[in-house]
């Protein structure tokens, strides 16, 4: 499995806030899904409130 750096923004109470996180996943699509699931569970966000801008290996 490779390590991917996922960047993007999410909707916070005071506007959109940027983020950068590192995820270990077999491919880029799985890294995106893990990021959406992680932010959704940690911050109580829906997928429409998270915008992923890029996934880099």
Curated annotation (Swiss-Prot):
Disulphide bond pairs: none
HAMAP family per UniProt: Ribosomal_eL20
GO terms under biological process: translation
Top-level taxon of origin: Archaea
Assembly, per entry: Part of the 50S ribosomal subunit. Binds 23S rRNA.
GO molecular function annotations of the record: large ribosomal subunit rRNA binding; structural constituent of ribosome
Any one of the GO CC terms: ribosome
Gene: rpl18a
Listed InterPro entries: Ribosomal_eL20, Ribosomal_eL20_dom
Family designation: Belongs to the eukaryotic ribosomal protein eL20 family.
One Pfam short name: Ribosomal_L18A
Name of the molecule in the record: Large ribosomal subunit protein eL20
Alphabetized UniProt keyword annotations: Ribonucleoprotein, Ribosomal protein, RNA-binding, rRNA-binding
């Amino acid at each position: 499995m490779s390590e991917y750096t996922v960047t993007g923004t999410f909707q916070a109470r005071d506007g959109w806030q940027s983020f950068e996180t590192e995820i270990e996943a077999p491919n880029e699509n799985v890294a995106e899904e893990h990021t959406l699931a992680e932010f959704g569970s940690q911050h109580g966000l829906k997928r429409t409130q998270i915008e992923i801008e890029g996934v880099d290996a």
